[in-house]
Structure formats: C-alpha cells, structure tokens
Amino acid sequence: MTSAANKIRKAQTNDPELIAQINKISTVAAAMWMTVVGTLGILFLPLMVGGIISELGFTEKLAGYIAAAEMAGVAVVSGLGVFWVRRINWVTIAILSTVLFIAANWISTGVTEYWPMFASRFLVGAASGALLAIGLACQSDSKNADRIFGYWVACQMAVSSAGYILLPGVRATWGLDGFLFALIILGLTAFVSIVFLPARGLNRASAQEKQANKILTSALALGGALFFFMAQGGLWAFLERLEHSCMLSKLLFFFQI
C-alpha cells in the first residue's frame, strides 16, 4: 500500500524542469501563437462566408450552415479538451492538428459543392479546436497565467487587425482560394510553435473538498461564455454581408473592423 501511495504521489508531483520549461519566454510565446493559429478560422470567418456566397454561389442559408460547421468543430474538440488535454502528448497532437488544418484548408480550395465544403470546414474547425485547447492549457500552467492570457488577447487582436487590412485585398486579387492559401501559410507557422512546446502540461490534481466550488464556478463561467458567443457568432459570420447589403466601401469597412 505504501509503495502504491508513493507512486501516486510521485506521479502527481510536477517535474521542476517541466515547470521551468513552461515558464520560459519561448514556451509562452509558442503557446500564445498556437492559440492564435487555433482562432484564425473564427477571426476571419466573415471573409470566408462572403467568398463562398459571392464566388461559389451558395445561398446565405447554406453559407451560415458551413460557418456553423467550422465553429462546431472548434467547440466540440476544444470542449472535449477537458478530457484529453492532460492525458495526450501535446507535441504529437499539435503536429497532427496542424497537418489537418493545412490539409483541410487546401481541400477547401478545390471544393464547389455544399457537403464537401461543409465537411472540410468542420475539419478545419476541429484542428483549430485542438490547437486552441493545447495552447490555452500551456498558458494556464504558467505562473503568470492571467497576464499571459491578456497578452494573448492583445496578440490575437493585432493579428485580426492586420488580417482585415491585408486579407480583403488578397481575396479581391486571388479570390477565395487566395484567402484559403493565406490561412495555409499562417497555419504553417504553428510548426515553429511546436518546436518550443512541452510534451505535456502540469498535473492539475486538487483536493476533493475544493471540487464542488470549482464545478459551480466553472459551470457559471462556461454558461456566460456560451451565451456571449451565441449572441456574437451569428452576427460575426455575416458581418461582410452587412457591408454588402449597405453598399459600403470594402476597404473602409474592413479597416473599421
């Protein structure tokens, strides 16, 4: 019994080298960028929706379903991350997810039918969700997790701002395929982050008496996030179509975003 207890205690003890690695600037930066790559599809969803409507001739209803498929992929895989993100090798999953992100975006460039596009965008979302879950888990293990989360949001908004200045021109010049290839190029940068990523995170085992409070607060936080993104998601996907219906200048509209 004593031997078994010692093994469990040892397994629950975090390696000092792992703690040091997770708090390195290179690891923090890698985790931040990985989460940015994991949100690229959602950040630039209006450009994708506008492209499949104007270039592929999909109705707004079908385009909405395709956008929902991509967001569902992110939600399902990142949501299930509570079960797998502490149990699976981060580097392996990050490599597979990045390959899937690139491959699914590449497949999307040759698709003109609804169901293949629906499936490919769901796969993009699933890959994005895995990268997002790993990146956020790595950030949360840092000793300055709250501050790093703020830096990540700032980085995400900076990338979004630059993207909405540059990517509309890319789509106008090279079409929807050009936009998707831009996502592929950005996705390739995730491999750089993987180089600095630890294979696993810290052990998050906690005392039983604290679990009830954690479950309650987590449920409230998740509920609030759910309602926020439900309100935001439907409008966000069709943001470019609002510009189109109001006949605004695309350059000015995306610059304002």
PLM region spans:
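Extracytoplasmic gate region of multi-pass secondary transporters
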Residues: 45-46, 218-257
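Helix-breaking motifs and short loop linkers at transmembrane-helix boundaries and internal kinks
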Residues: 57, 110-112
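Helix-to-loop junctions at the C-terminal end of transmembrane segments
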Residues: 77-90
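Structural signature of the two symmetry-related core transmembrane helices
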Residues: 92-106
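Paired small-residue
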Residues: 104, 115-123
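Intracellular juxtamembrane helix-capping segments at the cytosolic ends
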Residues: 130-143
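Glycine-rich segments within core transmembrane alpha-helices of 12-TM secondary carriers
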Residues: 146-165
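C-terminal membrane-cytosol helix-exit motif in multi-pass small-molecule transporters
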Residues: 168, 179, 184-205
